[in-house]
């Protein structure tokens, strides 16, 4: 049984005010929290310099990109479209690095603008070599192992297609030699919500990869640092996980004279607990004495897909003054039995009741921990529900809209 959890940065008064001004459902981001998390990553222990790249797939809103840019963070993009989105937000091309499953058709234009590109397969490397012989390139490797919060967020090892398999270094060297290209960066990323010990082990393996290429100056160790959304879940301590790796960089410099620059690319760590989804209880139903009592919200997998996809756990708070609690199953508004917001741990098809404030139809509700991989990774427009509004709770000033609520006309505007 999951216990009731508190609100993070909202309170009953602010919830009511935001709902009145912007409607529900809507995502609410805390600028103060975002800046605090970014500050933590900028203190990541390093030996010879650090670049923090925001994995913008976590939440690509232009306002969020601009906040991170103002703090000196760079951008990790996962598609050509994300690159263009970052450019439109005012991010300088030289601060953007693309590591993509699909090399965009206009990759040459992006490269010429100054966008850094990591080859994520041998074919991508060949295409880059043909387009830019004698130039520099980054190499994303699959180091042979991975780790993620679930199998679906593990992007390393033999079951993952991400990156060049680590045993294909001879082929990589041959392509570089023929094209006279220089490998300037090595990149590895093993998954989201990864085990810190596995991350450390892969970091050492990545340094071994660096030694295979004499011109490498930068090693990007990816992100994936675990963030506890529920009170019972632990978060990665960046200082603890990074200090041994700093020492490994220093040892490499002592033994070889090579002072390697470190990059990391967090997404979840920067945003997960810095946004809340404000919604309403729109219906209550039950399945008798042997069944369950269900809360139906005016949101669901159209905004928060992670519980349905990963059996991920998110705190849910009924915003009322009730002094008694009750066990509920919380579901979304989609015509889909999988639109479940309270799955069991590790099993998206099994129901796990939550002990929440006793609620009535019309009560406000807050789903916490939705800053990363929610607004950006949802079943957009399923059942023709429009994209919801996103608002920012700034450090100073009034809460303001950063993405307008979509209309039905906007949903159908491209139909012919």
Task: Annotate each predicted stretch with a short phrase.
Residues 1-135, 173-182, 211, 353-355, ...:
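A charged N-terminal "starter" segment
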Residues 10-13, 29-36, 59, 123, ...:
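Conserved active-site and cofactor/substrate-binding residues in soluble primary-metabolism enzymes
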Residues 34, 57, 79, 110, ...:
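Conserved, mostly hydrophobic/aromatic
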Residues 49-53, 72-74, 93-97, 114-116, ...:
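Structural preference for beta-strand elements that scaffold enzyme active sites
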Residues 55, 99, 120, 140, ...:
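Generic beta-strand/beta-sheet core signal
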Residues 58-60, 81, 102-104, 121-123, ...:
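Active-site-proximal loop/turn and secondary-structure-junction residues that shape catalytic pockets
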Residues 131, 143-285, 385:
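Active-site loop/helix belt of alpha/beta enzymes
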Residues 259-416:
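Charged (often Lys/Glu-rich) extended helix/loop segments that serve as interaction or gating elements
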């Amino acid at each position: 049984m999951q216990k009731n959890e508190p609100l993070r940065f909202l309170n009953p008064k602010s919830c009511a005010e935001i709902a009145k001004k912007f409607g529900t459902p809507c995502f609410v981001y805390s600028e103060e929290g975002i800046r605090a998390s970014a500050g933590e990553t900028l203190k990541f222990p390093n030996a010879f310099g650090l670049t923090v790249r925001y994995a913008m797939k976590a939440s690509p809103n232009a306002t969020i990109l601009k906040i991170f840019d103002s703090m000196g963070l760079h951008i990790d993009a996962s598609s050509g479209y994300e690159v263009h989105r970052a450019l439109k937000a005012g991010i300088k091309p030289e601060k953007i690095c693309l590591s993509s499953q699909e090399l965009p058709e206009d990759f040459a234009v992006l490269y010429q603008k100054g966008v850094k590109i990591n080859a994520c397969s041998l074919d991508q490397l060949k295409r880059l070599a043909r387009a830019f012989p004698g130039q520099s390139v980054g190499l994303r490797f699959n180091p042979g192992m991975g780790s993620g919060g679930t199998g679906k967020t593990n992007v390393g090892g033999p079951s993952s297609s991400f990156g060049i398999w680590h045993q294909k270094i001879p082929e990589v060297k041959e392509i570089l030699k023929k094209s006279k290209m220089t490998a300037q960066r090595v990149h590895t990323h093993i998954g989201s919500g990864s085990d810190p010990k596995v991350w450390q082990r892969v970091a050492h393996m990545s340094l071994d990869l660096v030694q295979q290429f004499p011109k490498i100056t930068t090693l990007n160790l990816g992100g994936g640092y675990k963030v506890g959304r529920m009170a019972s879940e632990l978060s990665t301590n960046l200082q603890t996980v990074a200090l041994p790796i700093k020492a490994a960089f220093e040892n490499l410099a002592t033994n070889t004279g090579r002072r390697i620059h470190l990059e990391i690319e967090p997404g979840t760590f920067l945003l997960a607990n810095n946004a809340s989804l404000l919604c309403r209880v729109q219906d209550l139903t039950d399945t008798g004495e042997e069944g369950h009592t269900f809360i139906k919200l005016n949101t669901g997998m159209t905004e928060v897909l992670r519980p349905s996809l990963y059996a991920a756990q998110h705190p849910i708070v009924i915003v009322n003054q009730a002094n008694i609690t009750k066990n509920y199953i919380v579901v979304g508004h989609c015509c889909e039995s999988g639109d479940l917001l309270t799955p069991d741990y590790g099993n998206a098809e099994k129901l796990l009741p939550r002990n929440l404030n006793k609620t009535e139809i019309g009560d406000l509700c807050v789903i916490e921990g939705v800053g990363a991989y929610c607004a950006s990774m949802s079943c957009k427009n399923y059942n023709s529900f429009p994209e919801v509004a996103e608002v920012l709770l700034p450090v100073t000033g009034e809460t303001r809209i950063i993405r307008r609520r979509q209309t039905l006309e906007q949903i159908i505007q491209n139909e012919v």
